[in-house]
Regions:
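Short, amphipathic alpha-helical interaction segments positioned at domain boundaries
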Residues: 218-244
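Conserved C-terminal guanine-recognition region of P-loop GTPase G domains, centered on the G4
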Residues: 80-131
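Short amphipathic alpha-helical interaction segments
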Residues: 179, 185-201
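Short amphipathic alpha-helical interface segments
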Residues: 157-179, 183, 244
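Canonical P-loop GTPase G-domain recognition
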Residues: 113-163
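Switch II (G3) loop of P-loop NTPases
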Residues: 46-61
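Inter-motif core of Ras-like GTPase G domains
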Residues: 60-82, 95, 99
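Conserved G1/Walker A P-loop phosphate-binding module
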Residues: 1-50
Length: 244
């Protein structure tokens, strides 16, 4: 899976990726400012998660657009302490809606370790974040809730595909199961091929086009059966306007 880590300038994107990868990330920067991208790889419940961090300066819009291509989810960082950064945050939020319409987003209200950090409810109001978007209070510097924020995003992303995956489970490992899936979904071969290729690229399935068999990967089977397993020991409260 590809996750875009974005947000305003100095919101903590590079530090977030370093924290999630335990320091095993790559950054292209100049004088402590990301000028191209950050990259890291993590495994959560056997799902391989590719993290791509974007530069935050406004004039890097084209690069953010390139990096966003093919993203399955967006971890959007907000500087909880610096209200002046909200103007840039709103601009980049608009870019996300433009580049990745309909793609799941989770907000990390970052820098919660600093004095005068805003509460989640204040950030939601200041940035006009929709009530169906989770906001997780984090500190990339201390590691507070960084894994939780990513896991919440993964849960939202997987749940988006859950109905389809449950239908696919019926024909998992079945000879000519792809034909059965076509019938169930009312889709032509071209559309099915495109969708299965998309799922295979993300590590959800393995496909043998000679026999028209597909197999859901063990990791995704586990998630289908227990989707909230992704959240591990974390709790997510559905009430209180989706604040975490």
């Amino acid at each position: 899976m590809k996750i875009l880590v974005t947000g305003s300038y100095h919101s903590g994107k590079s530090t977030m990726i370093r924290s999630l990868t335990k320091g095993k990330s790559i950054s292209i920067d100049k004088q402590d400012t990301t000028v191209a991208l950050d990259y890291g790889l993590v495994n959560i419940e056997d799902l391989r998660i590719h993290l791509f961090g974007t530069p935050g300066l406004k004039h890097f819009k084209v690069l953010r657009q390139v990096l966003s291509k093919g993203a399955d989810g967006v971890l959007f960082l907000v500087d909880s302490q610096d209200k002046n950064s909200d103007v840039e945050a709103k601009i980049i939020w608009g870019e996300v809606q433009e580049f990745l319409p309909g793609v799941p987003i989770t907000v990390a209200a970052n820098k919660q370790d600093l004095p005068n950090a805003r509460e989640v409810s204040r950030i939601r109001k200041d940035l006009d974040i929709p009530p169906d978007v989770y906001i997780v209070p984090t500190s990339a510097k201390t590691g507070q809730n960084v894994e939780k924020a990513l896991r919440v995003l993964l849960l939202v992303a997987v749940q988006k595909e859950l109905n389809l995956l449950k239908i696919m489970q019926k024909h998992d490992g079945e000879v000519k199961g792809i034909h059965s899936l076509m019938s169930d979904l009312g889709m032509e071969m071209g559309a099915i091929r495109q969708h299965l290729n998309w799922l295979e690229l993300r590590g959800y399935v393995e496909v043998d086009w000679r026999t028209f068999i597909y197999w859901l990967t063990p990791a995704i089977k586990k998630v289908i059966e227990q989707p909230k397993l992704i959240l591990k020991e974390f709790s997510v409260h559905e009430d209180s306007i989706k604040e975490v």
